[in-house]
Regions:
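A short, exposed loop/beta-hairpin motif centered on an aromatic-Gly-Thr core
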Residues: 77-86
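Short linear proline/tyrosine/threonine-rich motifs used for host-factor recruitment
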Residues: 36-38, 62, 79, 113, ...
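A short, structured beta-strand/loop element
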Residues: 64-71
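Intrinsically disordered, low-complexity proline/glycine-rich segments
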Residues: 68, 127-129
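Short, positively charged and aromatic/hydrophobic N-terminal segments
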Residues: 3, 7, 13-14
Length: 132
C-alpha cells in the first residue's frame, strides 16, 4: 500500500470533500473499484458503493479493500492506494483532480496553478495545499 498526503492551509469541510470525491471518481472510473480476494483468487467490483458479490459464509480467508481509500483529519488528506492495482502517477493525478474539485466547490472564484508538489493561488500567490 502506497500513501500520498495532501496538507491544506485551512481545515477541510466534509461536504466539499464529498463533492470533490464524487467528481474525481467520475473522472477516473478505473480507480473506482474494490478488490476482493477469496482463497487466493482476486476479483474486482466496479463501484465501491455497490454491495460485494455473494461469498461463502466462512470468511476466514477473505480480504476486501478499495483501490483508493481517502481519509482526512483537520488539514490533512491521506490517500492510500494499492500498488498492485494502480500506479503512483494515476493516484497523483487523482489527488490533483480532487483538490481542484474540492476548491471549486469550497472557493468557487479561486484560480489555482500547480507548481511541483504545491497548489498555489494565482492572485495572492499563497499555498493552498502541499502534496507529499
Amino acid at each position: 500500500m502506497g500513501k500520498i498526503v495532501a496538507t491544506f492551509a485551512e481545515p477541510l469541510h466534509h461536504i466539499c470533500l464529498t463533492y470533490g470525491l464524487k467528481q474525481s471518481f467520475d473522472a477516473m472510473p478505473h480507480l473506482n473499484r474494490r478488490e476482493i480476494r477469496l482463497r487466493g483468487k482476486s476479483t474486482y467490483i466496479e463501484n465501491i458503493v455497490a454491495p460485494p458479490p455473494l461469498m461463502s459464509r466462512s470468511g476466514w480467508n477473505t480480504r476486501c479493500r478499495n483501490i483508493v481509500s481517502v481519509s482526512y483529519w483537520r488539514e490533512s488528506l491521506a490517500i492510500a492506494y494499492n500498488d498492485e492495482a494502480c500506479t503512483k502517477e494515476d493516484v497523483y493525478t487523482f489527488v490533483i483532480a480532487l483538490i481542484k474539485a474540492y476548491m471549486s466547490y469550497r472557493h468557487p472564484y479561486t484560480k489555482m496553478r500547480i507548481e511541483g508538489n504545491k497548489v498555489v493561488s494565482e492572485r495572492e500567490g499563497r499555498i493552498i495545499a502541499t502534496i507529499d
